[in-house]
């Protein structure tokens, strides 16, 4: 590691500890050339996947765009910002842990539907009507029947 004070590459680790969450390591280092001490942090770099849209184009995952989708679906609904933030974080974390470089937009949409179903049934119906391009009242009826049946096998109970 290059010393930030003198630029020397001759540094030694004198202390190394994991943070409380266990997802980063703090290292105390000493430069052999100038004897100054400095701290470095080591974390894993997880890059979100590219989203492959239905027309085949690719775009970077956008947490802002995801939040905006939740905001539109939850417009004038009694759901706290904290709950939305938690849902967005779960989706982001899920996408990161997939380990895939590309994820179909359809898969992101399904994750949003799962989260909205837990947060607010009306928002779920709103989102589903746009996401699944409802054409007639029967499409709404199908979703309402699905909601009335309760959780299905494979639905996340959290």
UniProtKB/Swiss-Prot annotation:
The keyword Ribonucleoprotein does not apply. The keyword Secreted does not apply. A zinc finger (unnamed) spans 3-34. Its cofactor is Zn(2+). Keywords: ATP-binding, DNA-binding, Metal-binding, Nucleotide-binding, Repressor, Transcription, Transcription regulation, Zinc, Zinc-finger. Binds 1 zinc ion. One of its GO terms (biological process) is negative regulation of DNA-templated transcription. Residues 49-139 form the ATP-cone domain. It holds the Pfam family Zn_ribbon_NrdR. Negatively regulates transcription of bacterial ribonucleotide reductase nrd genes and operons by binding to NrdR-boxes. Belongs to the NrdR family. This is Transcriptional repressor NrdR. It comes from Thiobacillus denitrificans (strain ATCC 25259 / T1). The gene is nrdR.
